[in-house]
Amino acid sequence: MNRELGLWGEELAAQYLRKKGYKILERNFHTRYGELDLVCEKDDNIVFVEVKTRRSTRFGSPEEAVTPRKIGNLKKAAILYLKSTPRFFPEISFDVVSILVEDGKSKINHIINAF
């Protein structure tokens, strides 16, 4: 995947989530375990959102790129984020926003509490 497509997908996902009532707290939060694409707040809870954007399903759907190893790293990165903020969140969840771009159209699939 090229970086430009990924950044475009993250922006589209952020716009989509804002319309759904999410507040974007951080974008591209870097840790030694990898990057948290979007860190959001919804109903006083924190939501870590992994965004996957693809131009085709030839190698699987975008959400299939969220492997067990990736999930483990996202959870470790989330712990580091939580340690870095003084805020308390009663609930923590992980969502996936997959974006498939085909024939000039984008299809968004938002998986709430994906793992």
Swiss-Prot record:
Pfam families: UPF0102
Species: Syntrophomonas wolfei subsp. wolfei (strain DSM 2245B / Goettingen)
Single annotated GO MF: nucleic acid binding
Descriptive protein name: UPF0102 protein Swol_1475
Annotated InterPro entries: Restrct_endonuc-II-like (IPR011335), tRNA_endonuc-like_dom_sf (IPR011856), UPF0102_YraN-like (IPR003509)
Domain of life: Bacteria
Assigned protein family: Belongs to the UPF0102 family.
CDD domains linked to this entry: PoNe_Nuclease
SUPFAM superfamilies recorded: Restriction endonuclease-like (SSF52980)
Gene3D superfamilies membership: 3.40.1350.10
